[in-house]
Amino acid sequence: MALHPSYPLRSPRLALRPVSEQDIDALVAYRSIPDVCRYVPFEPMDATAVRERLRGLWARRVLEADGQPLLLGVELAATGELIGDVMLLWASAEHRSGEIGYVLHPAYSGQGYATEAAHRILHLAFDELGLHRIIARVDAENHSSARLAARLGMRQEAHLVQNEWFKGRWSDELDFAILGDEWRALAHSGCLPDASS
């Protein structure tokens, strides 16, 4: 089984699409900022590091096997400007499970773009790819990301205390999850945030 999204993935204000070499400057613009990288599993990146990822892990356009991530750029539909990225990891084909992550340029925070992009990636995971369960693993100090997971209808299932040694400290991890049936029930009831909020 392979997961073949049709690009771009559209939402009211955004287009999600695979990143390419033309995006190097835009990717470096936010992935080089130390504060952006504080809670994510990578260090600030320069153009060389971004180029290596574009030729490797980020070159993927489809998901063909467990453990593969799909990284999509978050582009403003009105201007074509790349302002962040979202990731869908296909964790298990057998269990139809995945994980999401998101990174946004800080100049665009507080405007609902991260919520809209994550909402769209969950729609892809559940409604287009048929996954059953999606998780988000959040550093407990990353309050914005935890609030975003809750806005998406994800429930906090665990608080793992000093779960791993991460960037020079013992890190607590919050695990959030949502099932496909829960996602569809929330969408049908109108309880999910508007994709643009």
Locate each region found by the language model.
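Short helix-to-loop capping/linker segments positioned immediately adjacent to catalytic or ligand/cofactor-binding
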Residues: R60-L63, G110
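Acyl-donor (CoA/ACP) binding surface of acyl/acetyltransferases
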Residues: M1-R38, L71-S197
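Juxtamembrane/interface motifs at transmembrane-helix termini
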Residues: D46-A49, W58-R60, V103-H105, P193
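Short loop/turn motifs at secondary-structure junctions and domain boundaries
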Residues: V62-G67, M154
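Conserved GNAT-fold acetyl-CoA-binding loop/helix
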Residues: D35-W58, L70-L72
